[in-house]
Amino acid sequence: MFITFEGMDGSGKTTTLLKVKEELERLNYQVLITREPGGEAIAEQIRQIILDNKNRDMDAWTEALLFIASRNQHLQKVIKPALEKNIIVISDRFIDSTSAYQGSARNIGVDVVNQVQQIVLKNCLPDLTLFFDVSFSEAEKRMQIRGENSKNRLDEEKSDFKQKVYQGYLELVKNNPKRIKVIDANQDIDQVYNQAIKIILEKLKENEKRTSN
């Protein structure tokens, strides 16, 4: 099964991902956790270009295509091989990030970005996506705790950009209710984790029941 975690920076998705992996492994599932951009040697090199603070003058389409190129490398070399071995793959970001950040916030257009992604990625979709919905104030507070030195080029975007990203995510949730489930990420990390693991275990049971019939 292929699961993705989506949301604004500071939503707690990365911390929750690690806790979910620990619990699934306790239940004897094989789990691979990975991230985007990156998750593979070449994809990680592309990540450095995308997030480098020196590259502030990057064109919106250049940014989008770099994300998609990194994603395809990650998909072909890491995600697909793991899925073929029946390993549960959980990725910190995937296609919905590009739809929200570049399609919505960069004003390229979600439909156009998704058309390119469908061509390159051959319409590969996650089985389940969790959207970690957090308020701007809570996200900013968590980002400050992370420290100034951890900020990358996208972290430093202005609030109007982040608002567009958030609205882009809400539109994705609205248009993909079966695949994308919302997590209230304003709560403390244990409550956020409890929401996430409940949804994931239900999906796993659903898949196991379907394959056994």
From Swiss-Prot:
SUPFAM superfamilies: P-loop containing nucleoside triphosphate hydrolases. Pfam families: Thymidylate_kin (PF02223). Keywords: ATP-binding, Kinase, Nucleotide biosynthesis, Nucleotide-binding, Transferase. It catalyses: dTMP + ATP = dTDP + ADP. GO terms for cellular component: cytosol. It is an enzyme of class 2 (transferase). It comes from the Bacteria. Disulfide bonds: none annotated. ATP binds at G7, M8, D9, G10, S11, G12, K13, T14. One of its GO terms (biological process) is dTDP biosynthetic process. Its EC number is 2.7.4.9. Coiled coil: none annotated. GO terms for molecular function: ATP binding; dTMP kinase activity. HAMAP family: Thymidylate_kinase. Phosphorylation of dTMP to form dTDP in both de novo and salvage pathways of dTTP synthesis. Belongs to the thymidylate kinase family. This is Thymidylate kinase. It comes from Mycoplasma mycoides subsp. mycoides SC (strain CCUG 32753 / NCTC 10114 / PG1). The lineage of its organism: Bacteria, Bacillati, Mycoplasmatota, Mollicutes, Mycoplasmataceae. The gene is tmk.
